[in-house]
Swiss-Prot record:
TM stretches of this protein: none
Function: Ligates lysine onto the cytidine present at position 34 of the AUA codon-specific tRNA(Ile) that contains the anticodon CAU, in an ATP-dependent manner. Cytidine is converted to lysidine, thus changing the amino acid specificity of the tRNA from methionine to isoleucine.
Binding locations of ATP: 25-30
UniProt source species: Photobacterium profundum (strain SS9)
Domain notes: The N-terminal region contains the highly conserved SGGXDS motif, predicted to be a P-loop motif involved in ATP binding.
Keyword Amino-acid biosynthesis: no
Catalyzed reactions: cytidine(34) in tRNA(Ile2) + L-lysine + ATP = lysidine(34) in tRNA(Ile2) + AMP + diphosphate + H(+)
GO cellular component: cytoplasm
Keywords assigned by UniProt, alphabetized: ATP-binding, Cytoplasm, Ligase, Nucleotide-binding, tRNA processing
Name of the protein this chain belongs to: tRNA(Ile)-lysidine synthase
InterPro entries assigned to the protein according to its UniProt record, in alphabetical order: Lysidine-tRNA-synth_C, Rossmann-like_a/b/a_fold, TilS/TtcA_N, tRNA_Ile_lys_synt, tRNA_Ile_lys_synt_N, tRNA_Ile_lys_synt_subst-bd
EC id: 6.3.4.19
Record's keyword annotation contains Signal: no
HAMAP family associated with the record: tRNA_Ile_lys_synt
Length: 435
């Protein structure tokens, strides 16, 4: 019964994939999925299958679990890869959210174009997800919960056990004498999902035995409504989207349509969707702001900013205004906070900077406050703030643009200009930025 359900889901949803990647935690659900896929691959040798175990390091048993997953995958003739991730405890992002984000990031390293990621969520997980969305006051997108099949970057993500109950999976594991790991954190009812699992859903099942199917139908209907809305607004979003992925404010239309377009736009990025209150704040404080204002709304380590009548999604970076790094000729200088590297390279001709003299130390900094500069070919000096405006550098990037100094004199602003006193043909300045 369980195998038949999995096989039908695989063949119905992924007709063009020939490689599967199992997210293998080692718990009951993924352990059963591994066993089922072992049989599927044996009966269908035209398909390939790997497994990935993500080692979070949160439990003293984590190393043991990883070894067990390797052994179980070996028994099924499936190659298993171990991915180690590090979580930051005590920050604003919950351990649950961090673990989920890091887990999918680790899994993505093993899923290539056209592959299919398999995860073992089941009908009881769907019920919990729906209840958590209700608790948050989610709209149709959140209440749609987990789709059986969706995209995963340039590949696919399938949950082939989503219509199966937890009890059916347990019965299968026992019947086939499978072993699995028991994560002690699953008993910790400080986590919302565990509280629901142990305290709430048993009562719901007792009162309404058909609640899993009812919730599954409601989630599917919400998903259909959200998909329909996105389809109807797709051409509107395309018109509002700038080539740099910013959003043109003038194309947003009414508040009702505009806020939905902002949600669709944000779905293009790897950010947590803002709450209704945050979305309202984005509309009131950023979209409707005066043209000369510099508004921002922060959430989930990101910001919504406005510049030149367009909206931007900007990551919240640490302050690097005090950063100062000495640079050597022809050696890459590492920059902080995802800004990549900067290298001053000697060339025979057609460079942009003169060579530093013997007594001149080359350094890179980021604090533009109070600095004046005269770009090569310009008349008169101007404050860097004014020059950044002329060069149309958004305000949030002005303290993230490398300033190259010879001793304590500004020689160049990476990517923009060289100052008059330091112009020459001896060196090139290359900024390879990651962000």
């Amino acid at each position: 019964m369980l195998y038949s359900s999995l096989r039908s889901s695989l063949l119905a949803n992924i007709p063009h994939s020939n490689r599967f990647v199992i997210a293998l935690s080692g718990g009951l659900d993924s352990r059963v999925l591994l066993h089922l896929m072992g049989r599927f691959i044996q009966e269908n040798p035209q398909y390939q299958c790997d497994a990935v175990h993500v080692h979070h390091g949160l439990s003293v048993n984590a190393d043991k679990w990883a070894q067990q997953c390797l052994q179980w995958a070996f028994e099924e003739k499936i190659t298993c890869h171990i991915e180690h991730v590090t979580l930051v405890l005590g920050n604003r992002i919950s351990v649950e959210q961090q673990a989920r984000e890091q887990r999918y990031l680790a899994l993505s390293k093993h899923v290539q174009q056209g592959d299919c990621l398999l995860t073992a969520q089941h009908a009881d997980d769907q019920l919990e997800t729906f209840l958590l969305a209700l608790k948050r006051g989610s709209g149709p997108a959140g209440l749609a919960s987990m789709p059986e099949s969706t995209t995963f970057g340039i590949s696919y993500h399938l949950r082939p056990l989503l219509q199966v109950t937890r009890q059916s999976i347990t019965d299968y594991g026992i019947a086939h004498q499978l072993e699995w790991v028991e994560d002690e954190s699953n008993q910790d009812q400080r986590y919302d999902r565990n509280f629901l699992r142990h305290q709430i859903t048993p009562l719901l099942h007792q009162r309404w035995p058909g609640i899993r199917k009812a919730v599954s139908r409601s989630a599917a209907l919400c998903g259909e409504q959200e998909a329909l809305l996105n389809e109807l607004l797709a051409s509107h979003l395309s018109k509002a989207l700038h080539v740099d992925q910013s959003l043109k404010i003038v194309e947003l239309g009414s508040e009702r349509i505009g806020k939905q377009l902002i949600r669709q736009w944000l779905s293009l990025f790897t950010v947590l969707m803002p709450s209704q209150a945050q979305l309202q704040q984005i509309w009131q404080s950023v979209v409707l702001a005066q043209d000369d204002a510099n508004p921002q709304v922060c959430w989930d380590n990101h910001q919504i900013r406005r510049y030149k009548q367009r909206l931007y999604v900007v990551k919240q970076w640490a302050d690097i205004s005090l950063f100062q790094q000495k640079c050597e000729l022809n050696q890459a200088c590492s920059l902080p906070e995802g800004l990549g590297t900067l290298v001053l390279t000697t060339v025979k001709a057609n460079g942009i900077l003169r060579l530093p003299q013997q007594h001149e130390i080359v350094s890179v900094r980021f604090e533009p406050e109070g600095i004046e500069a005269k770009p090569q070919g310009r008349i008169g000096k101007r404050k860097l703030k004014k020059l950044f405006q002329e060069y149309e550098v958004p305000s949030w990037n002005r303290r993230r643009t490398p300033l190259v100094f010879y001793n304590d004199r500004l020689a160049a602003v990476a990517g923009l200009f060289v100052t008059e006193d330091f112009f020459g043909e001896d060196c090139d300045l290359d900024w390879l930025c990651n962000s």
